[in-house]
C-alpha cells in the first residue's frame, strides 16, 4: 500500500509541475513572478533520474543495464576541448559561512509596499527599494511592454529607505516623485545608487539623496531591443573598475556590459557563445574569479559566464552552471568571497528557501531559510550580514529578513 501511495504522489507531483503557472499566485504577484514555469528539459531529466533511482531503491523498477561506450565523434571531441578548466574541488566546509536568522529584526514593523530590492551601503546600512502602493499586475503593461499607467505619475512616497543595521529602524528616506515601478537596487563601493525601473525601461546611477541621475541607460518609457534601449531591466552589478552590467531583463533576456562612462562594451550572450537566458532576474560579480553570476530565473539555474574584467580571455567560454532538481526558479543572487547565495521563488511543490552555492565546483553546498515570495538579496561589504526581501500583498508580507553569516 505504501509503495502505491509513493508512486501516486510522484505522479501527482510531476503533473503539478507540468501544469503550474503564475496564475495560482496571489493577485498582484503573478506578473512580477513571471508568466509561468518554463519547462527546462535538463531540469526535468534530472528529476526523472532522481525518481528512477528512488524507484529502483524501493524495488519498483529494474536497474538499467550499462550501455556500451560509443566512440567520440569529431563534434564531441571539439566540445570536450572547449570545456572550462574550473577548479572542481569543493570548498572546505569550515570556510563556508552559514546564514543564521536574526530573530525579531526589524524591531518595529514597517509599512513598505512590495520590497523589490535591498542593497548595503559602504557604512553597512541596509537600503530597501519598494513600490509603495503600486503593484505589477495584468493591467500594468500592454502586449508591446508599454507601461499603461503613465498618467498616474511617479510614486509620490519615498521609495528608498536607509535602515539601521542593528534595529532595522528607518534612518532616512528619499526617492519620492521619481520612479514608476521600482525593481533593482545596487550600491557601489563609492556609495552611488544604481537603480532599475521596469516601467520606465531605464537604468540609473545616482548620488545618494539626489533627484538628478549621473548616468541614464535606456529610453524613457520606450522599450526596445537595440543597443540604446532596454526592456524591463531587472538588476545591475558594478565592478571596482567602474565597469557595470545591466540585466535586461524580462523582454530581451540579455546582459549588457558598459564601461564607467556608459559606453557599451559587450552583450551576453553573443555568438559564438553557447548560452541562452530566460529572464535574468538578478546578477552579482565575483571579481577575483572574473565571474558574473546570473539568476537565470525561467531556466531554473544560476549561470556564471566570464565577466571579462581582468582580460577578454575566456569570454565566450561555456558558463559555469548550477542547476539541480530542488533549485527551482531563481529570483535573487548575492556573493561574498568564493560563495554565491541564492533564493528561489514559487516553483510548483519545491520548498522556497535559500541556497549556498560554490560556482567553481558548480554545486549547491547548503540550504537555509524558509520564505514565501523572496525577490532580492544582498550581502554587507564585510560579509557579516545577509538581507533578503519578500514581496506580497500587504505590509506583513512585504518585508526584509536579516541573517548573520556565521
UniProtKB/Swiss-Prot annotation:
Instruction: Name the Gene3D superfamilies on file.
Output: TolB, C-terminal domain
Broad class of enzyme this protein falls into: lyase
Q: Which residues form the signal peptide?
A: 1-19
User: Which reaction(s) are listed as its catalytic activity?
Assistant: a [peptide]-C-terminal (2S)-2-hydroxyglycine = a [peptide]-C-terminal amide + glyoxylate
GO MF assignments: metal ion binding; peptidylamidoglycolate lyase activity
Entry EC no(s): 4.3.2.5
Question: Where is the protein localized?
Answer: Secreted
Q: List the disulfide bonds.
A: 231-251, 293-304
Q: Where are the NHL repeats?
A: 168-209, 218-261, 264-308, 358-402
Q: What does this protein do?
A: Peptidyl-alpha-hydroxylglycine alpha-amidating lyase that catalyzes an essential reaction in C-terminal alpha-amidation of peptides. Mediates the dismutation of the unstable peptidyl(2-hydroxyglycine) intermediate to glyoxylate and the corresponding desglycine peptide amide. C-terminal amidation of peptides such as neuropeptides is essential for full biological activity.
Return the similarity comment.
Belongs to the peptidyl-alpha-hydroxyglycine alpha-amidating lyase family.
Put simply, this protein is called Peptidyl-alpha-hydroxyglycine alpha-amidating lyase 2
Which species is this UniProt entry from? Answer: Drosophila melanogaster (Fruit fly)
Amino acid at each position: 500500500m505504501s509503495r502505491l501511495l509513493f508512486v501516486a504522489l510522484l505522479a501527482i507531483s510531476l503533473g503539478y509541475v507540468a501544469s503550474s503557472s503564475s496564475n495560482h499566485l496571489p493577485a498582484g504577484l503573478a506578473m512580477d513572478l513571471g508568466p509561468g514555469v518554463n519547462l527546462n528539459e535538463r531540469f526535468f531529466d534530472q528529476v526523472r533520474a532522481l525518481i528512477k533511482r528512488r524507484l529502483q531503491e524501493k524495488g519498483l523498477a529494474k536497474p538499467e543495464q550499462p550501455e556500451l561506450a560509443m566512440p567520440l565523434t569529431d563534434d564531441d571531441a571539439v566540445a570536450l576541448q572547449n570545456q572550462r578548466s574550473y577548479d572542481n574541488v569543493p570548498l572546505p566546509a569550515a570556510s563556508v559561512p552559514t546564514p543564521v536568522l536574526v530573530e525579531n529584526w526589524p524591531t518595529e514593523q514597517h509599512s513598505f509596499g512590495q520590497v523589490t530590492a535591498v542593497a548595503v551601503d559602504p557604512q553597512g546600512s541596509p537600503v530597501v527599494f519598494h513600490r509603495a502602493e503600486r503593484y505589477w499586475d495584468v493591467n500594468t503593461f500592454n502586449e508591446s511592454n508599454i507601461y499603461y499607467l503613465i498618467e498616474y505619475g511617479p510614486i509620490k512616497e519615498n521609495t528608498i529607505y536607509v535602515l539601521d543595521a542593528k534595529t532595522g529602524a528607518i534612518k532616512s528616506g528619499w526617492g519620492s516623485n521619481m520612479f514608476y515601478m521600482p525593481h533593482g537596487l545596487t550600491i557601489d563601493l563609492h556609495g552611488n545608487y544604481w537603480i532599475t525601473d521596469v516601467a520606465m525601461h531605464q537604468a540609473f546611477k545616482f548620488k545618494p539623496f539626489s533627484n538628478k541621475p549621473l548616468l541614464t541607460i535606456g529610453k524613457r518609457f520606450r522599450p526596445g531591443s537595440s543597443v540604446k534601449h532596454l526592456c524591463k531591466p531587472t538588476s545591475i552589478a558594478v565592478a571596482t573598475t567602474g565597469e557595470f552590467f545591466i540585466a535586461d531583463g524580462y523582454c530581451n533576456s540579455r546582459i549588457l556590459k558598459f564601461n564607467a562612462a556608459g559606453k557599451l562594451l559587450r552583450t551576453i550572450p553573443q555568438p559564438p557563445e553557447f548560452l541562452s537566458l530566460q529572464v535574468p532576474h538578478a546578477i552579482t560579480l565575483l571579481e577575483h574569479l572574473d565571474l558574473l553570476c546570473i539568476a537565470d530565473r525561467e531556466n531554473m539555474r544560476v549561470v556564471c559566464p566570464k565577466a571579462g574584467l581582468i582580460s577578454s580571455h575566456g569570454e565566450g567560454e561555456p558558463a559555469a552552471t548550477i542547476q539541480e532538481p530542488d533549485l527551482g526558479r531563481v529570483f535573487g543572487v548575492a556573493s561574498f568571497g568564493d560563495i554565491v547565495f541564492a533564493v528561489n521563488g514559487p516553483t510548483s511543490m519545491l520548498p522556497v528557501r535559500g541556497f549556498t552555492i560554490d560556482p567553481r565546483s558548480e554545486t549547491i553546498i547548503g540550504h537555509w531559510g524558509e520564505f514565501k515570495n523572496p525577490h532580492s538579496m544582498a550581502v554587507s561589504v564585510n560579509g557579516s550580514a545577509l538581507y533578503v526581501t519578500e514581496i506580497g500583498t500587504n505590509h506583513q508580507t512585504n518585508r526584509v529578513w536579516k541573517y548573520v553569516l556565521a
